Amino acid sequence: MILKKLVYPFLLVCLFSTGTFAQRLMHSIGITPTLLFGKSDDGYNSDVMIYQNMITYYPRFNFVENENSSISIGAPIGVGFGLARTTDYSDVGISFSYDLPVALDYNIGFKSTMENEHYFGGYLGMGFGYYKVSISKSAYSDFSGATYGPMARAGVRIGSAKESWKGHGLTIGFFYKKGIEKAKFSSAGCNVLVDL
């Protein structure tokens, strides 16, 4: 998949970057509760929901910066597990998944740049997401599907004096991805991340 070919090299560069590049590279880590929903392809056309709790690592690189804002590209990748079920509870299973999105964001205020001293900020962005799910202990145990499509995202960043949070901040964001694969599974979720 083309997305995998883009994300993996990006992550390697993020992990081994130094010098000036590292000053523009910012990291966050946290949790992302996510809900996937769509129709089953079992012939019954049942409504299916998959609830996931994911651990998320988000490296982002600011490639345009000014005093109070930036434009960044990032990859809020995650891995997690959860429950898959039909909406009438006729079938329930355990799911494992990973998420490989790429996001382009406009950042303003707090943590838009390393030098920004505001205590409040936010972001608005778009991207493309790839989400792989495997289900076990269910009638859908053979399902090992992927959902992918365009994504919209937005959120706020909150900080405080360096003495209390040691310069770290908190990001609370929301996203929605519309699946364009055959099953057309969509996903929505909330990021709660600590900005390092």
Where do the protein language model's features map onto the residues?
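Cleavable N-terminal export/targeting peptides
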Residues: 1-26
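A periodicity- and composition-biased signal for non-globular, repetitive helical segments
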Residues: 10-11, 29, 163, 183
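Ubiquitous "structural anchor" signal
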Residues: 17, 22, 38, 82, ...
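Intrinsically disordered/low-complexity terminal segments and short unstructured peptides
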Residues: 17-19, 31, 86
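Short glycine/proline- and aromatic-enriched beta-strand/turn motifs that initiate or cap beta-hairpins
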Residues: 21-68, 188, 193-195
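Transmembrane beta-strand segments of Gram-negative outer membrane beta-barrel proteins
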Residues: 23-35, 73-77, 122-126
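Outer-membrane beta-barrel transmembrane domain signature
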Residues: 58-71, 79-185, 191-196
